[in-house]
Amino acid sequence: MSTTDIYNYLKISERLVTGGQPTADQLRDAAAEGFTAVINLYPSNPPHSLDGEGELVESLGMAYVHIPVDWSNPTDADFAAFESAMNRLAGEKVLIHCAANFRVTAFYGLYARKHLGWPDEQAEAFRAQIWAGSDYPIWEAFIARHSA
């Protein structure tokens, strides 16, 4: 098993991957593969989240950032917290996840557009590997607001 087995796994670079909710074993694999940080955008919601995830991640020697983004109400504050975490962890090997890599692909696409110079088309194509924003009007509006 490895991090590549995480649900909806996407590799952005050697230092950055995204995915859905990892199992405890997949988090152990992440530590063994040299990841130094985990950003979790999924609210604590057992059984869909991993109970004690933060403690496990930290016990494995990785930094843990939890930004619980409500699927039905993503906020500007959520995105600002994500931007701050990404900027703080620049240069680290980071696993970013939520439940199914929906929140993450939206947030990372917006982040990469704003901070890494990705054109709109690249950010859209990145997210579209996992889901279509038009399927979720709240998210479509959130993405449009941050793309303006």
Model segments located where?
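Structural motif
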Residues: L16, K93-V94
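Gly/Ser/Thr-rich helix-start
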Residues: G20-Q21, F102, L110
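N-proximal short alpha-helices
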Residues: T3-T4, K11, A30, E55, ...
